[in-house]
């Protein structure tokens, strides 16, 4: 089991998803310090307070401070690893991407693994290239953005751009804005 201790409830889903991507066979339990309960009144019942936390061989502590986030990782039989990085909490998307990027690099360092989709978890991976292409970005600009922001592999970036282009071709023939959409999830 992997335990995660947070002092705020922000980005819990993203943290959980990224840890599960690196450790698919492990249960991941999220715990909160008392400060998180005081700040966030709507904490889900399935989450636990740090007081009830059981001793785990693998543990992460993520602390949100004024203008930075600190991550400490202790995996069984390994020396602890940590990183601290500056963030601007006013920009939620930028903060989330910085958190996921730094957590990813820390996980990559301690596990020796990398993920083909990088930090992209739980989303339709063609949504981002499709949006960027619709904004007039070139395929090269889209690829650079996905590599820099989401740390995706070249193979997966090329695949997502190719599928986004096919999707754009199909959608250009339909009046999808006044109709219905059906999404069928097919794993890549």
Language model features with spans:
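Cysteine-centered iron-sulfur cluster-binding motifs in ferredoxin-type domains/subunits
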Residues: 185-188
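A short, structured N-terminal alpha-helical element that caps or precedes a catalytic domain
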Residues: 1-109, 113-115
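N-terminal [4Fe-4S]-dependent radical SAM core
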Residues: 107-114, 134-183
């Amino acid at each position: 089991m992997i335990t995660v201790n947070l002092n705020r409830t922000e980005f819990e889903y993203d943290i959980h998803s990224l840890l599960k991507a690196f450790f698919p066979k492990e249960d991941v339990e999220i715990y909160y310090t008392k400060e998180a309960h005081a700040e966030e009144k709507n904490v889900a019942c399935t989450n636990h307070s740090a007081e009830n936390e059981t001793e785990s061989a693998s543990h992460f502590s993520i602390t949100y401070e004024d203008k930075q986030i600190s991550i400490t990782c202790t995996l069984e039989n390994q020396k602890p690893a940590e990183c601290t990085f500056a963030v601007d909490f006013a920009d939620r998307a930028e903060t989330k991407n910085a958190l996921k990027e730094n957590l990813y690099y820390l996980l990559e360092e301690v596990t020796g693994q990398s993920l083909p989709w990088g930090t992209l978890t739980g989303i339709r991976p063609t949504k981002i290239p499709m949006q960027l292409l619709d904004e007039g970005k070139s395929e090269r600009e889209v690829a650079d953005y996905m590599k820099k922001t989401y740390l995706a592999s070249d193979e997966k970036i090329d695949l997502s751009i190719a599928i986004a282009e096919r999707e754009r071709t199909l959608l250009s023939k339909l009046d999808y804005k006044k109709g219905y959409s059906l999404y069928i999830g097919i794993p890549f």
